[in-house]
């Protein structure tokens, strides 16, 4: 199925690209989430009419994400967790706990933005965590896992 992207989609393309994807991916994810529209003549004309508006919206999101990256970069987030004598956690620290720690400091962060390619944190200590905010805009925060008393 051919579609026109209304937003940047990782692995597919950016705004205005005409790409071919599987029908299920388009119908069940891209189109309902407003990331794409079918590439039929009427929809193409509608997209071209809205193109400038969508490009401005994307530019605003990029600028806002760059500003957020600047404010988040280098921050230290403290997460409290129960741990044994050897520093092993009872459970683990994942994206949800990192987002909660950011919110406690007044920082806005979403679970999808936290990248943990090596899995959850299972020991006390400091860890550098990558954040993928929007498109190519990334930031890094330090997560300090300490014992909860």
From Swiss-Prot:
InterPro entries: Ribosomal_bL9, Ribosomal_bL9/RNase_H1_N, Ribosomal_bL9_bac/chp, Ribosomal_bL9_C, Ribosomal_bL9_C_sf, Ribosomal_bL9_N, Ribosomal_bL9_N_sf. This is Large ribosomal subunit protein bL9. The keyword Ribosomal protein applies. GO terms for cellular component: ribonucleoprotein complex; ribosome. Binds to the 23S rRNA. Pfam families: Ribosomal_L9_C (PF03948), Ribosomal_L9_N (PF01281). Belongs to the bacterial ribosomal protein bL9 family. It comes from the Bacteria. Keywords: Ribonucleoprotein, Ribosomal protein, RNA-binding, rRNA-binding. GO terms for molecular function: rRNA binding; structural constituent of ribosome. One of its GO terms (biological process) is translation. SUPFAM superfamilies: L9 N-domain-like, Ribosomal protein L9 C-domain.
């Amino acid at each position: 199925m051919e579609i026109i992207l209304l937003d940047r989609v990782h692995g597919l393309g950016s705004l205005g690209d005409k790409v071919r994807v599987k029908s299920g991916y388009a119908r069940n994810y891209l189109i309902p989430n407003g990331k794409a529209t079918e590439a039929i003549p009427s929809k193409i004309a509608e997209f071209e009419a809205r193109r400038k508006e969508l490009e401005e919206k994307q530019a605003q999101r990029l600028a806002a994400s760059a500003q957020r990256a600047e404010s988040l970069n280098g921050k230290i987030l403290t997460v409290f967790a129960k741990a044994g004598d050897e520093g092993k956690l009872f459970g683990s620290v994942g994206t949800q706990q990192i987002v909660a720690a950011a919110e406690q400091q007044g920082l806005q962060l979403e679970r999808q933005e936290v990248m943990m390619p090596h899995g959850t944190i299972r020991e006390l200590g400091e860890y550098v965590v990558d954040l993928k905010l929007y498109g190519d805009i990334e930031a890094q925060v330090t997560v300090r896992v300490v014992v909860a008393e």
